[in-house]
């Protein structure tokens, strides 16, 4: 809804979200978080067609893994903050995506969020996750 409001008022914007896995961890149901990707991608495409500059990035498969943070399920916000403070590679990775999100660029790069499915499929292969039920399409 926020993307549609920004588009209506002709306000350029940036989007960052997790791609997530196509299925739930057991692989027996569609992951609703993954299903939203297409809606976001289509809405961003519409905004661009309307002449807006939209920077669109995705964390594959999620923010923590994308930025090489190993976090427990408990205390994630604090542990994330601590990782950024203490681990240079994590801080650098996050700074890079934040700089992309605030930059003005009319070209659409290969890491654009509209390529989320290909990005995830490549990640699955590179990380040998093909046999995990949640990554089955």
Predicted region positions:
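Acidic, divalent-metal-binding catalytic cores of TOPRIM
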Residues: 1-137
């Amino acid at each position: 809804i926020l993307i549609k409001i920004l588009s209506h008022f002709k306000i350029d914007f940036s989007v960052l979200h997790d791609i997530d896995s196509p299925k739930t961890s057991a692989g027996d149901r569609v992951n609703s978080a993954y299903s939203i990707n297409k809606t976001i991608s289509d809405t961003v495409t519409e905004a661009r067609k309307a002449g807006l500059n939209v920077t669109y990035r995705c964390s594959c498969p999620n923010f923590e893994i994308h930025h090489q943070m190993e976090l427990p399920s408990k205390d994630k916000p604090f542990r994330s903050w601590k990782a950024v403070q203490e681990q240079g590679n994590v801080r650098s990775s996050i700074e890079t995506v934040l700089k992309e999100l605030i930059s003005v660029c009319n070209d659409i790069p290969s890491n654009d969020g509209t390529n989320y499915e290909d990005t995830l499929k490549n990640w699955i292969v590179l990380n040998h996750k093909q046999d995990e039920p949640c990554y089955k399409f």
